[in-house]
Amino acid sequence: MDRKIDYLIVGQGIAGTILSYKLIKKGYLVKVIDDGHRTASSTKAAGIVNPITGRSYVKSWMIDELIPEAIRTYRSLENELKGKYYHEHTIVRVLGSIYEENKWSSRLLDGAYSKYIIEDYDTSSLDEHFKDVKSCAIIKGGRV
């Protein structure tokens, strides 16, 4: 007798893959269908993990809980599949006005943001496109 499928997941992009992985780890029988469509969002999305976003440089919703869980999940998946899926990256954000510089400065002083900010960053190592930039925010981020 065939076991009944507990979950049917349509699409095996980043979200579908992680959801199916988590459900399988919990003992559920999962079926994933995917048409391999080249215009699927996972082929277009950069998979960027940016903990500080928006004009006011606020922490992304639930980021303190989500990043550690994401890293644990990807590391577990990497271990099982012998691949590399989560990559830590530096995010450079150009500060184009005094307002933006002031907002960023307030984040530098806020301890709740410190684990996501790189303060002493050698900007001379940045790409030549940033050579005329007077001020920038350096954020610890990642990508999938």
Segments from the language model and where they lie:
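Hydrophobic anchor at the start of a short beta-strand
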Residues: 7, 30-31, 115
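Beta1/beta-strand and adjacent pyrophosphate-binding region of the FAD-binding site
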Residues: 2-15
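Helical element adjacent to the flavin cofactor pocket in flavoenzyme catalytic cores
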Residues: 135-144
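Short beta-strand/turn micro-motifs composed of small residues
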Residues: 11, 34, 95
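Dinucleotide-binding Rossmann-like beta1-alpha1 core, especially the glycine-rich loop
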Residues: 48-127
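Short, flexible turn/loop "capping" segments at secondary-structure junctions
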Residues: 42-43, 85-86, 129-133
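Glycine-rich FAD pyrophosphate-binding loop
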Residues: 24-43
